[in-house]
From Swiss-Prot:
This is DNA-directed RNA polymerase subunit beta'. Binds 1 Mg(2+) ion per subunit. Residues 1389-1409 are annotated as: Disordered. GO terms for biological process: DNA-templated transcription. The lineage of its organism: Bacteria, Pseudomonadati, Thermodesulfobacteriota, Desulfuromonadia, Desulfuromonadales. Its cofactor is Mg(2+); Zn(2+). Pfam families: RNA_pol_Rpb1_1 (PF04997), RNA_pol_Rpb1_2 (PF00623), RNA_pol_Rpb1_3 (PF04983), RNA_pol_Rpb1_4 (PF05000), RNA_pol_Rpb1_5 (PF04998). SMART domains: RPOLA_N (SM00663). DNA-dependent RNA polymerase catalyzes the transcription of DNA into RNA using the four ribonucleoside triphosphates as substrates. The keyword Manganese does not apply. SUPFAM superfamilies: beta and beta-prime subunits of DNA dependent RNA-polymerase.
Length: 1409
């Protein structure tokens, strides 16, 4: 009887396990799990469609094909449950066991598992110390291996050819040793290994060995050994005696019509194995010749290889259609494998998709859902309500009713969808705002209506985009959708904490038009309908705007006057305003009518000053931000909706449109062009005379045109933004223009100055497909029209833009995927980790300009120590206090230049990150909550703009966006010039010439505070002496941006050394000019070192013998600018190194740059950096490299070898600091980490990544990049093991290393020593603790092989592994501390229980009393 009841039991909770272990299966395990041996290759009988007995689909082994029915039909239905039929041997149970029952194949000879053989490094090879090549020879029957040398002089595991083996047998006798071929022999070898003994041997070997290579190799072997030791796996299990057979339902065979079958590739692969295995058994029974048996064994090995991993060795086995068969490994690997296709992303029920249209009348929390779609999505809910209401009695009748669409159904639908949020999603979902929840509003038609303000977040437009709708079913999911995902709760962007719900396009234009002011308007002639023109000046006649200068007693009066038509929207008026924020008395305020009308929609807590200005897109964004900070979320949502309405309304009333005459071409255009052409001719002449090189000429020409384009654009914008007119009684006057194109660009509604430049200025320089700039610019603009040649030149750029877009989208998506993968387990795990470490943050400056103020960088962070006012010593911010907007203002007012804050990088939490180190949750505006998945947010914030930018490259239409190179520094303030570690010499003209690389100049005020600071280039000419007075706008320094000079510090006579024509130097003849110049070339003779020596003219402290006072080595490619034996003075240029011809900067250079930084790749020509502070001297050359020696004040000098021909940027006798480059080139992040440590590296990475995004005008908060960098720095490399169980060169998690050391130190032993390790994001993802997460990322087979050998346990701590296992993720509401909270739906039970328990006072008795 109990059997029957158990039928209704719920299945076991799928979440009741807490960890998963993977290990190598032993033959016993395989047989134990199997339900029978598959002996025949047959599948099913083609006539009866019943499975063949003992075949691949056998019902006896795998279970019945029909529920509760045996194969021959003797036993049917539930009553015979569990009986085994005596006729056909099939158990009477549900057919679903065919999805879980395994079979097995007993092999006639052992075979090697290809994963352990071929997955590099080969594990079998590592254990036996045989190379993969030899191992394959043995396994595929081309060579013999000695499995037991006994007492012969042969080596264990020695590999030899057949001839040698036979010779040895003759020499030592047949029983003197044992050996063989194929997997059997290898299995014997593996069995013979004593893990403990070998491990001990290797450890001693490692201690004693001197060569680095040997130690590394031994360490690798030890690693595999230790893995086997600790996991309890036996090495011989890597050789298979029997193979498991997958359950048949997982490799189905489906009959098609016409008598054919569609089958899974696995069946073919299994059939091959079974056929070959059976043939081999027969051959062995028949005692066939050795050759034939060997061949058959080899074929069996190949068949098993193909089954496990087809194509890994040799050619892939192809099916009948010439397509390689999909093996077990292929089922797991790649985008369409099990992990990524079915476990990490599934298709779901209760969803639909449709085209979107704009819904301007919706509220922010609503979306329009087509009735048809709602009816389908909410079906079960509708059936339930219909039954509840008594309209129907059965589900069937409810179904009919809904199909007929009776009026009752629509009423019920209205009720069902009330307050039931739905989720809208637009692909590609690049950040979390790509899925948001809305309350549905039923609409006619078939398109989903979307609120215009959320388009930015979805990156949606209405040109045919589609969106998907999903329905949260359970009460919990509805609560989450409403509280966390509702569009009204996602006003701020998680990437930078500024509002993302901001009016755009028409709405901006409307608000901008409302809040503009004007004093005069044009006069239209009643009769002609055209504007009146003043005869004398030829300018249009304007008159005063209606209502200008009127005074009102309050905003309501303004509204009445405006509605009555007495004042104009843009009229400037005076209004008496109450200040609702503070209780000051009302004031008279100068404003415009439009601004007063806009004030009506503001909440009381936002002051009028927030809208008393011209509202462009940026100001509107600030307004929403201000409202969010001053009022609350609800007020902000209401404001956003009102802004939308008022924006659309007044954009409509403004009636702004574009016409050709709006594109005003500047009058000075021809003049600027002629001037530029003349300059180009002049440069050309200089080149023909040989004064400059071709590269310099090209760079200068490009520069002239870039400047001309900028000048024309500037004049055009000035023209557009102002208009001149004639006013009777006033005369000629001008004020800001109401030109439609200018208004659109100025307000930020549509278009950019770049685009207007192309419409009405000149298109400018274009790039070739290779990225170089074509030196003839397009001088026309779109209004004038392009000539055929100009049009042809511009097609390059346009096409490149389209091609880039396609490629970059994929690249950016891949970057995001890697970032998410590396950061997925960075979760807020605790309140405070109690660290005493943090980062020092200061303002970011570039070229003396502050690009990011300290305030923006510390906002939303937590102070590490008390922040004190430098003058009064008061505490501005207490330690561990969140720095909010008010505190930022206090810090900035106090003039602090550096602030210590807590950072994710220095957080001491073991798993995850603590709330204090992270700071503010940018999307919510308060301290971050426990369980927030900050890693994924960081990854999305960095990845999302990547795709945005790459999708947007082509909008400029391929114009080369290149600025004229900066050639001088101008001062921004008055003050006194100060040199900061700057070496200079005074040249013949009396200017200071900069002679070192990291020098800076600063302008200080009377009190000595630095007002501005600039890095100055080597070779720059400083115009003012130190301590000299600086005036604002005065030139401080000048330099040539196209060449890198080599300067002399001494005056004297030039003497060439090793500069031999045809050996180290060649005279390059310029085709065009016929003049030659001396260029250093790479010389075959490594002893030759081209240099220029300066001989003293007497008086200088010269070298006594040679008279040399200075020597300068010349790199390859340097152009010599002085003659031998000529006389020069200090500060003169003796040679020039041309800089690279500039290519256009674009995120196409940017995205790969970001990827390069996060992958921690070594740059191509990276600079060697000094590891210590000290003085520089040159040593003897070695192996064609130059030797630079850095000698510190105390301690050993360090030597660096620098490749010949690279320009060394330090001179003999210079003082260098640790981390300073000794040559030109980009920094290598690994060097920075080694020399300067974690914080400097983090600073470098954050700044570099930010620079790429800043170029594109994308804002990302620093903390996101820090989170990723933290994940890249999680591991350390062991340098010295001490008394720990770690291995040399092992990479372990930092906290594992620390715990291990703590343990050893507590016992009073020697701790291990390690160095920090910087892993690229791909490497870091693959080396996570969880093998499930790593396997689903990349290199699936490799990860699983390693995990199996180690017997790894996955404790399911990250997000990905839990998604794969189908559990709640341990973040957000799935955090383990929240998981145990359950919702009680029926409220009756707990109360009843409570009444039964003792400690509850009985209410009824109390009432009676």
């Amino acid at each position: 009887m109990e059997d029957y009841f158990s039928f209704f039991d719920k299945p076991k909770d799928p979440l009741h396990f807490s960890a998963i272990r993977i290990s190598v299966s032993s033959p016993e395990k395989i047989r134990e799990r199997s339900h029978g041996e598959v002996k025949k290759p047959e599948t099913i009988n083609y006539r009866t469609f019943k499975p063949e007995r003992d075949g691949l689909f056998c019902a006896k082994i795998f279970g019945p094909t029909k529920d509760y029915e045996c194969n021959c039909g003797k036993y049917k239905r539930m009553k015979h449950r569990g009986i085994i039929c005596e006729k056909c041997g099939v158990e009477v149970i549900p057919s679903k066991v065919r999805r879980e029952r395994l079979g097995h194949i007993d092999l006639a000879t052992p075979v090697a598992h290809i994963w352990f053989l071929k997955s590099l490094p080969s594990r079998i090879g590592n254990l036996l110390d045989i190379t993969l090549k030899d191992l394959e020879k043995v396994l595929y029957f081309e060579a013999f291996v000695i499995s037991d040398p006994k007492n012969s002089p042969l080596q264990f595991c020695e590999v030899m050819s057949e001839d040698k083996f036979l010779k040895a047998q003759q020499e030592y006798g047949y029983d003197a040793f044992s050996g063989g071929m194929g997997a059997e022999a290898i299995r014997e070898c593996l069995k013979a290994i004593d893990l403990d003994e070998l491990s001990g041997q290797l450890r001693t070997e490692m201690m004693e060995s001197t060569s680095e290579a040997k130690r590394k190799k031994t360490a690798k072997r030890l690693k595999v050994l230790e893995a086997f030791k600790s996991s309890g796996n036996k090495p011989e299990w890597m050789i298979l005696e029997c193979i498991p057979v997958l359950p048949p339902e997982l490799r189905p065979l489906v009959p098609l019509d016409g008598g054919r079958f569609a089958t899974s590739d696995l069946n073919d692969l299994y059939r091959r194995v079974i056929n070959r295995n059976n043939r081999l058994k027969r051959l062995v029974e028949l005692q066939a010749p050795e050759v034939i048996i060997r061949n058959e064994k080899r074929m069996l090995q190949e068949a098993v290889d193909a089954l496990f991993d087809n194509g890994r060795r040799g050619r892939a086995i192809a099916g009948p259609n010439k397509r390689p068969l999909k093996s077990l490994s292929d089922m797991l690997k790649g985008k369409s494998g099990r992990f990524r296709q079915n476990l990490l992303g599934k298709r779901v029920d209760y969803s639909g998709r449709s085209v979107i249209v704009v819904g301007p009348e919706l509220k922010l929390h609503q979306c329009g859902l087509p009735k048809k779609m709602a009816l389908e999505l909410f079906k079960p809910f509708i059936y339930n309500k219909l039954e509840e209401r008594g309209y129907v009695t059965t589900i069937k009748s409810a179904k009919k009713m809904v199909e007929k669409e009776r009026p009752e159904v629509w009423d019920v639908l209205e009720e069902v969808i009330r307050e039931h949020p739905v989720m809208l999603n637009r692909a590609p979902t690049l950040h979390r705002l790509g899925i948001q929840a809305f309350e549905p509003v039923l609409i006619e038609g078939k398109a989903i209506q979307l609120h215009p303000l959320v388009c930015t977040a979805f990156n949606a437009d209405f040109d045919g985009d589609q969106m998907a709708v999903h329905l949260p079913l359970s009460v919990e999911s509805q609560v989450e959708a409403r509280v966390l995902m509702m569009s009204t709760n996602n006003i701020l962007s998680p990437a930078h904490g500024k509002p993302i719900i901001v009016p755009s396009q028409d709405m901006v234009l409307g608000a901008y038009y409302m809040t503009r002011d004007r004093r005069f308007e044009r006069v239209i002639d009643e009769t002609t309908g055209k504007e009146k023109i003043d005869a004398e000046s030829g300018l249009p006649i304007y008159r005063k705007v209606k209502g200008t200068g009127k005074v009102f007693s309050g905003p309501d009066e303004v509204r009445i006057a405006f509605d009555a038509g007495e004042v104009d929207m843009q009229a400037t008026v005076k209004v008496r305003m109450k200040n609702l924020v503070s209780d000051e008395k009302p004031q008279m305020i100068d404003t415009t009518v439009g601004r007063v009308i806009l004030k009506e929609i503001l909440p009381d807590s936002v002051p009028f000053s927030a809208v008393n200005k011209v509202m462009n897109k940026k100001e509107l964004s600030n307004l929403v931000d201000t409202c969010y900070r001053m009022a609350d979320n609800k007020e902000t949502v209401i404001l956003a909706d009102k802004l939308k309405d008022i924006g659309f309304r007044y954009a409509n009333l403004a009636g702004i449109s574009i016409c050709l005459d709006d594109m005003v071409i500047p009058e000075g255009k021809t003049e600027i062009l002629t001037k530029a052409e003349d300059e180009v001719k002049e440069i050309q002449n200089q080149y023909t005379e040989g004064l400059i090189t071709d590269g310099e000429r090209y760079n200068k020409v490009i520069d002239i045109w870039a400047k001309a384009t900028e000048d024309i654009a500037k004049e055009m914008l000035d023209n557009l933004s102002k208009e001149k007119f004639f006013v009777e009684g006033v005369g000629v006057s001008e004020e800001a223009s109401f030109n439609a194109i200018h208004m659109m660009a100025d307000s930020g509604a549509r278009g950019s100055h770049q685009q207007i430049r192309q419409l009405a200025g000149m298109r400018g320089l274009m790039a070739k497909p290779s990225g170089e700039i074509i030196e003839t610019p397009i001088t026309a603009n779109f209004r004038e029209g392009l000539t055929v040649l100009q049009y042809f030149i511009s097609t390059h750029g346009a096409r490149k833009g389209l091609a880039d877009t396609a490629l970059k989208t994929a690249n950016s998506g891949y970057l995001t995927r890697r970032l998410v993968d590396v950061a997925q387990d960075a979760i807020i795990a605790e309140e405070d980790c109690g660290t005493l470490d943090g980062l020092v943050v200061s303002s970011l400056t570039e070229g003396g300009e502050v690009i990011e103020h300290i305030g923006d960088r510390i906002l939303g962070r937590v102070a590490l120590d008390d922040i004190l006012d430098p003058i009064t010593g008061d505490v501005l911010v207490a330690a561990n206090e969140d720095i909010d907007e008010n505190l930022v203002k206090r810090i900035e007012d106090a003039g602090l230049e550096k602030v210590k804050i807590r950072s994710v990088l220095t957080c001491q939490s073991r798993r995850g990150i603590c709330s204090k180190c992270y700071g503010r949750d940018l999307a919510r505006g308060h301290s971050v909550n426990m369980g927030e998945a900050v890693g994924v947010i960081a990854a999305q914030s960095i990845g999302e703009p990547g795709t945005q930018l790459t999708m947007r490259t082509f909008h400029i239409g391929g114009t080369a966006s290149r600025r004229a190179e900066q050639t001088s520094l101008e001062s921004r303030t008055d003050g006194i010039l100060k040199f900061i570690n700057l070496n200079t010499v005074i040249n013949a003209e009396g200017h200071h010439i900069v002679m070192n690389r990291n020098g800076e100049i600063a302008v200080v005020d009377e009190t000595g505070r630095e007002r501005e600071k600039y890095l100055v280039l080597y070779g720059a000419k400083i115009k003012i002496a130190p301590g000299g007075a600086v005036t604002q706008g005065g030139i401080l320094a000048e330099w040539d941006p196209y060449t890198m000079p080599i300067l002399t510090e001494f005056s004297g006579k030039v003497k060439f050394g090793d500069i031999v024509e045809g050996v180290t130097m060649e005279e390059q003849l310029d085709e065009v000019t016929g003049l030659s110049r001396k260029v250093i070339i790479e010389s075959k003779d490594s002893d030759k070192r081209p240099r220029i020596a300066i001989k003293g003219m007497g008086g200088d402290s010269a070298d006594a013998v040679t008279g040399t006072i200075g020597r300068y080595f010349l790199p390859v490619g340097a152009n010599i600018t002085v003659q031998d034996d000529s006389v020069i003075s200090a500060g003169d240029i003796i040679a020039k190194i041309p800089r690279e011809t500039t290519k256009t900067k674009d995120i196409t250079g940017g995205l790969p740059r970001v990827a390069e930084l996060f992958e921690a790749r070594k740059p191509k020509d990276f600079a060697v950096i000094s590891e210590i502070d000290g003085r520089v001297s040159y040593g003897k050359d070695a192996k064609g490299k130059r030797k630079v020696i850095v000698t510190p004040e105390m301690g050993e000098p360090k030597e660096y070898l620098i490749p010949k021909g690279k320009h060394i940027s330090v001179h003999e006798g210079d003082h260098v600091r640790a981390g300073e480059p000794l040559m030109d080139g980009s920094s290598n992040p690994h060097d920075i980490l080694r020399v300067l440590g974690v914080k400097e590296l983090a600073k470098y990475l954050v700044d570099e990544v930010q620079e790429v995004y800043r170029l594109q005008g994308v804002k990302i908060n620093d903390k996101h990049i820090e989170v990723i960098v933290r994940q890249m720095l999680r591991r350390v490399r062991i340098k010295d093991v001490g008394d720990t169980s770690l291995l040399v060169d092992d990479q372990v998690e930092r906290w594992v290393f620390e715990t291990e050391n703590q343990k050893v130190m507590n016992e009073g032993k020697r701790p291990a020593i390690a160095e920090p390790l910087l892993l690229g994001i791909t490497k870091a993802s693959l080396s996570t603790e969880s093998f499930i997460s790593a396997a689903s990322f990349q290199e699936t087979t490799k990860v699983l092989t390693q995990a199996a050998i180690e017997g790894k346990v996955d404790y399911l701590r990250g997000l990905k592994e839990n998604v794969i296992m189908g559990r709640l993720i341990p973040a957000g509401t799935g955090l383990s501390s929240y998981r145990n909270i359950r919702m009680l739906t029926e409220a009756s039970e707990p109360v009843a229980q409570a009444a039964e328990s003792e400690d509850v006072p009985d209410v009824s008795q109390q009432e009676a009393a």
